[in-house]
Design a protein with these regions (language model features):
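Signal peptide processing junction and immediate N-terminal pro/mature segment
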Residues: 29-47
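Glutamine-centric residue-chemistry signal
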Residues: 85-89, 143-147, 257-258, 312
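Extracellular polysaccharide-recognition and catalytic grooves
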Residues: 94, 197-377
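N-terminal catalytic cores of secreted or lumenal carbohydrate-active enzymes
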Residues: 96-198, 204
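Low-complexity, Ser/Thr/Pro/Gly-enriched N-terminal "stalk/linker" regions
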Residues: 43-114, 122-125, 129-137, 197, ...
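Aromatic- and histidine-enriched alpha-helix N-cap/loop-to-helix transition segments
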Residues: 79, 103-114, 130, 156-168, ...
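Bacterial N-terminal signal peptides
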Residues: 16-30
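N-terminal secretory signal peptides that target proteins for export/translocation
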Residues: 1-14
Length: 377
């Protein structure tokens, strides 16, 4: 009888224990399903998985426009918008494309027109209509060279250059929609939306995508650029296929990060392109805060910025030692000078992430950089 009673007790405990396990598992499944692939802008609490532990993290519910309006971005990076117009012709052609128009260069690059993004967003934040109109003029010149399949006629480095321009336009239009001037510039948003959508549909054509991704292989930052270009356009237009492609690019980028936080460029580290990639990944986080990839993207950004901090000298200057692409390694498109190291992408990456996470250590780093490069206390 005692043995039978003991066995019955074991069965009872086993059944209760199984129910508890099932309840716990069901709770986790419901939570994960609720956070998977949601495209709402309002960020809540997400799960960051580290070493098989679920650690809750909080991301700001602020809009991208509000992040762009934070002190250092608004008052330092967007302070001198007139300087961005100096390289632009009255017809809107910008940078290396000016040389192409005057037959001084063999190629033009659609990416050179992406600086309309800074002019428009900076103009929205600082109430500068002249800068906004100059930005639209840059975009207009670019789209004037778009052909029926969505690509840009004989632009150099077609896939990569297009991804730069697409990201800038999609990002700009989304920020306009969040700004107090959304009604004023509604016609411009309506005009550019189908044009940028057509460009992204060209990017994901099987033969175009395959070739473009192959050419992007040595450059980690391009994974996050492509993800932002396609993801933000998908968000803007409601095209879910673009968002799926953007997630592919995010996953590819995540797989490349080294244990020390480096996102490699041409087989090594680069203290400039490190933050360029982070900047685009941060935008992806802002627009897809509840996607199931977010915990890993947040972890990648934290590690990337922590490594970048090791490249900042006590003075606030960014070290170029060992860089594979900037600081005397590669020249800009028109060949007039070597690529510099920041400080724009570095200040933006740290300041923006401080706004998203509320972590003031990133803000302190951004201010340290600002003090050195802009002599602002």
């Amino acid at each position: 009888v005692a043995k039978k009673s003991f066995l019955l007790t074991l069965r009872y405990l086993a059944s209760r224990f199984s129910i508890l396990l099932l309840l716990q598992l069901a709770t986790q499944i419901v939570f994960i399903a609720a956070t998977h692939n949601s495209s709402t802008v309002n960020a809540g609490m997400h799960l960051l998985v580290r070493e098989n532990k679920q650690i809750p993290i909080k991301l700001s519910a602020k809009t991208d426009f509000e992040h762009e309006s934070t002190d250092l971005i608004a008052n330092v990076l967007y302070r001198r918008l007139s300087g961005l117009q100096k390289s632009m012709m009255p017809n809107g052609a910008n940078g290396a494309n000016v040389l192409w128009i005057s037959n001084q260069a063999r190629r033009w690059y659609i990416e050179e027109q992406r600086y309309g993004e800074d002019l428009i967003i900076g103009g929205l934040i600082n109430n500068d209509p002249q800068a906004i109109e100059a930005g639209f003029k840059m975009f207009d010149w670019g789209f004037a060279h778009q052909v029926d399949d969505g690509s840009f006629f004989i632009t150099g480095d077609r896939f990569h250059s297009t991804s730069f321009f697409v990201q800038s336009v999609a990002h700009t239009l989304l920020v306009i929609e969040q700004s107090p001037y959304s009604e004023k510039y509604a016609n411009q948003v309506a005009k550019y939306k189908p044009l940028v959508h057509r460009a992204t549909r060209w990017m994901i054509l099987p033969n175009v995508w395959k070739k473009g991704i192959r050419r992007n292989e040595p450059y980690t930052h391009r994974r996050y650029l492509v993800a932002a270009a396609l993801g933000l356009t998908g968000k803007l237009t409601g095209d879910e296929e673009l968002i799926k492609y953007s997630r592919k690019s995010i996953k590819d980028g995540l797989s490349l990060q080294r244990p020390d936080g480096v996102n490699p460029e041409k087989g090594g580290h680069d203290s400039s392109y490190q933050t360029v990639g982070v900047m685009y990944a941060q935008r992806w986080v802002t627009y897809f805060p509840n996607d199931s990839l977010i915990p890993k993207v947040v972890q990648m950004i934290d590690k990337s910025l922590s490594w970048e901090q090791t490249r900042i000298l006590p003075s606030g200057e960014i070290s170029t030692k060992g860089n594979t692409r900037t600081g005397g390694r590669e020249k800009i498109r028109d060949g007039s000078r070597y690529k510099k190291v920041g400080p724009g992408s570095q200040i933006r990456a740290f300041a923006y992430w401080a706004s998203v996470t509320g972590n003031q250590k990133w803000e302190e780093t951004a201010r340290k950089l600002t003090k050195f490069y802009y002599k602002i206390p």
